[in-house]
């Protein structure tokens, strides 16, 4: 599920696998249901920084130190006033996930309401600059006529239990909810319930009464949440006709340690080695403490890693290696079989790779306030209680991986599978690119639209960019010292036993090797195919910035920043892409995400990399004249004046 999306599956189309994917029957795709036909519509608008109307001087200036006290005249008030001015007739609520990022930009998010009920797929995000003025903003608010009748007066909607049953029956979910056994228990919020007495789901299903913006109007719906493992769904069931589903969002989008070290993508690139105290000393804690105690196993503040051979929802009591001396060194070779014989090494590798990535992202700005994955946020903002649950050798499938991203405060869940396209089969935990790809789904879902909103990559092109970001970060991290812009990279080559990887083309700056252009997205319905186009553009961006700023010492794990700006082109590209995610609107398209990256550079470097960024996108058809249309995109190789 992508961000409440089940993001992932290295997300492979089945036709690229040497063997068909196998799994237990809980997955929607395995129950003959195509949830992609229920995607949310892509309706967001993004007003980039140089298109924002001129503003009068504001009294509040955001602090570059990250001081985000909410008081009269602060950045939240500025954002609220801007919304009132822009859409004076709109009713809305402030989403409680605003924060000031490490670049000094304040991010504030609003949800539209009607009769006190959320219009669930309407969002207004305002980005406040260091000068206290509106820097940019995104908008998907409904501008049509609001229904005159208040449904709360006549209670003109179905019982939530009926909606749950409608979702189960329509989507053929492996959940049992007999009317005589199920009780809808009210929880905090208007018409908000948790269901007790069901079976088959990983946690108690939930339902909330909302409006949904669809086909130019509003439909009253029950938003039914069901976590069934391979999918974690928000199903929008018509509040009067419970056999009608309007839309579906899937949150699941794919000490001393002896491991393949950071930068070694898989066993073909290097050897395992013993690494002592790998965490960054200046971050909050080491990897085995969460403020409540020390864990002499693969558990800590950022992640909890274990085997999960049954593929079930339990993880707390699952097997994980233990070492009172915190020495996690276990045997592994590619010749070992079955995978259970090296489970300790697999779990340790997964725990190591994920924690290093957490720390790298933290330095680049994905921290507590931005919605990262930590049990204890150490009073630094955001919502805690949400480490990443990491399942090694998960028994729910093969030849894939996925990551479920609920909103901030709920743990993310990564499922890593074994791959049977080789003999002996291979464990995806030993291919860092797969782990990084999956974890990045959690990052992009938390940053886009704010940490409290995990459905902002649920549209087709948005979801495609989610896959592209995941491929981009996995590729950027594996660069070697001798690489140049002539170096090409694959995805999933080792695990899948496919020399050309699992994407249509290698990532390359050579248009013969990888000819992808923006307009290639026309007619595509696979998020992975669309994602390859987006990642191809970002690979161009990566090398343009490396050619200008160098790639730095790729053997060093920790990014080097000066005045908040990475000193090398590789980490600068990663930083700009991350900052762009936080600026862009909910459900963005390629054009809006490009503009957000340009705006991120304007904030971070005063736009000193403007031309490098434009040249990267224009090379592949996303230049100045590019226009988004879901069925007929307009490509452009045009550069702005001065480039």
UniProtKB/Swiss-Prot annotation:
SUPFAM superfamilies: Metalloproteases ('zincins'), catalytic domain. It is found in: Secreted. Glycans are attached at residues 271, 420, 510, 553. One of its GO terms (molecular function) is metalloendopeptidase activity. The keyword Acyltransferase does not apply. PROSITE patterns: ZINC_PROTEASE. Binds 1 zinc ion per subunit. Residues 47-57 have a biased composition (Basic and acidic residues). The keyword Zinc applies. Residues 60-71 have a biased composition (Polar residues). Secreted metalloproteinase probably acting as a virulence factor. Belongs to the peptidase M36 family. This is Extracellular metalloproteinase 4. It comes from Arthroderma benhamiae.
